[in-house]
C-alpha cells in the first residue's frame, strides 16, 4: 500500500470521535448540518536524497497531513477542542509504525476556522517525514 493509504487506514482504525468524511478517496460526500466530521487529506510536498553517494542514500519524503473538522454552526468550541485533544493524543510529535512505513509526525498546528455552509471548518495540520530507499 502507499504511504497515504496506510496513514488513512491508521486514522480510520483509531478515530472514533466523529464521522470521517472521505473526500480524498473518490467517495461522494455530502455533509449534513446536524453531524460533525473529520476530513483527512495528505499531500506529498518534497523528496530529497539525505546521503552521499546519492545512489545509496536514503530519500527523505515530506508530506502534509491535514484534518479539517466540520463542527455544527453556533455550537460553541467544546466539541472542537475535544477533537483537537484527541488528534494530539494520536499523532502530535509521535512516530507511527504502519505495515510498511515508520511515519514521523511533527507538532499539531491548528489554523483559523471559517464558515463553510452549515458548519464551522477548522483545519489542523501535521508535517510528516518518511525515509525510504
Regions found by a protein language model. Give the residues of each.
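Small/polar-rich, solvent-exposed N-terminal microdomains that initiate assembly or binding
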Residues: 1-57, 75-77, 82-83, 89-90, ...
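Acidic-leaning, charged glycine-interspersed low-complexity segments
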Residues: 21, 88-133
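Solvent-exposed, well-ordered amphipathic alpha-helical segments
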Residues: 40-44, 62-67, 84-88, 105-108
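Short, solvent-exposed beta-strand/turn "edge" segments of beta-rich domains on protein surfaces
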Residues: 52-60, 114-119
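Oligomerization/assembly interface segments of phage tail-like spikes and tubes
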Residues: 59-73, 120-131
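Charge-dense, low-complexity intrinsically disordered segments
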Residues: 74, 78, 113-116
